[in-house]
């Protein structure tokens, strides 16, 4: 089991686009998530966005760096950033993404 939540206990069903970057020394990195039309922004949803929670069998990774994107005053997307400050954090994040990707049909490709 691997899922993403914006409000504790409410799984996000929209699969994001994820972009990874790593520092030149390989010790730190960043993951940017982009959710187009996420269910948490649906008109019917009354849940507050309290962060982004990446939850799997090992536990959870939490970020509070979550931003809404608006078009014509209407919320349309969420962009969230996870900062990875060490190799163990990077490794943990990649294990989560392997599980999440396998369950949600995400693939991994390196940029040119």
Swiss-Prot record:
Compartments, record wording: Cellular thylakoid membrane
Sequence intervals crossing the membrane: none
Membrane topology reported for the UniProt record: Peripheral membrane protein
GO cellular component: photosystem II oxygen evolving complex; plasma membrane-derived thylakoid membrane; plasma membrane-derived thylakoid photosystem II
Keyword Lipid biosynthesis: no
Domain of life: Bacteria
Keywords from the named record: Membrane, Photosynthesis, Photosystem II, Thylakoid
InterPro entries xref list: Psb28_c1_sf, PSII_Psb28_class-1
GO biological process, one term: photosynthesis
One Pfam family it belongs to: Psb28
Family, per entry: Belongs to the Psb28 family.
The protein's assembly and partners: Part of the photosystem II complex.
Record's protein name: Photosystem II reaction center Psb28 protein
Lineage: Bacteria, Bacillati, Cyanobacteriota, Cyanophyceae, Synechococcales
Gene: psb28
């Amino acid at each position: 089991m691997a899922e993403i939540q914006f409000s504790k206990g409410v799984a996000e069903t929209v699969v994001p686009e994820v972009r990874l970057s790593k520092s030149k020394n390989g010790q730190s990195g960043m993951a940017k998530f982009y959710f187009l039309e996420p269910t948490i922004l649906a008109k019917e949803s009354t849940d507050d966005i309290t962060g982004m929670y990446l939850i799997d069998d090992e536990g959870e990774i939490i970020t509070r760096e979550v931003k809404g994107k608006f078009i014509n005053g209407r919320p349309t997307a969420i962009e969230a950033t996870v900062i990875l400050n060490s190799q163990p954090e990077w490794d943990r994040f990649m294990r989560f993404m392997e599980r999440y990707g396998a369950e949600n049909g995400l693939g991994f490709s390196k940029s040119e």
